[in-house]
């Protein structure tokens, strides 16, 4: 077997100590082009970065730790800022950040999360999370297969959305044509609508 299990803390460096939180009010005077990351991704843009490179970010607290309504782990690359609601990691041994990101997003971490009203994945527990590690070539192939699968899903979603819009348009068109008398041939020998209304009026009076 070429795979093994190892704790996340043994293959990563943690950079949480370099994070700097800035509240929304103070960010008003710092507007700029650099992404400002929180637990679930970009929440603002500021005028200077505190990180420059490629990092793995993992949400530290909040409801998303349980609900997973958006990815818990994601890649930040280039120049950016991170607040104290996302752990920030780099890896050892050329292990691709994408490999770890995809793994973290594929498993439930309930065992490592503390708190109920305010769920939290603290740094010590983060380091203890077991991760399956394969040879680098296999890791790269896994990443490729996942990306291709996600791309297929996205294309299918786009096609499905387009078809649903077309169905809505067709539905409206059919109703419109139906009540304009365009779905059935017009027979001059048929009694007119006026004649029908006269008959209804007579029936009501009788």
What are these regions (language model features)?
Residues 38-40, 48-105, 114-126:
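A short beta-sheet element
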């Amino acid at each position: 077997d070429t795979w093994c299990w190892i704790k996340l803390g043994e293959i990563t460096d943690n950079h949480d100590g370099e994070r700097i939180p800035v509240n929304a009010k103070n960010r008003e005077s710092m507007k700029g082009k650099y992404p400002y990351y929180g637990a679930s991704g970009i929440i603002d843009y500021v005028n200077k970065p505190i990180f420059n490179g490629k990092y793995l970010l993992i949400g530290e607290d909040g409801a998303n730790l349980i609900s997973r309504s958006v990815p818990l782990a994601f890649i930040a690359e280039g120049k950016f800022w991170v607040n104290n609601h996302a752990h920030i990691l780099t890896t050892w041994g050329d292990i691709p950040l994408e490999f770890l990101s995809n793994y973290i997003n594929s498993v439930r971490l309930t065992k490592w999360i503390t708190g109920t009203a305010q769920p939290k994945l603290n740094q010590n527990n983060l380091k203890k999370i077991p991760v399956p590690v394969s040879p680098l070539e296999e890791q790269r192939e896994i990443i490729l297969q996942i990306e291709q699968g996600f791309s297929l899903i996205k294309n299918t979603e786009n096609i499905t959305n387009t078809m649903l819009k077309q169905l809505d348009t067709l539905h409206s068109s059919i109703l419109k044509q139906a009540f304009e008398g365009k779905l059935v041939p017009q027979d001059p020998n048929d009694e007119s609508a006026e004649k029908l209304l006269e008959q209804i009026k007579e029936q009501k009076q009788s």
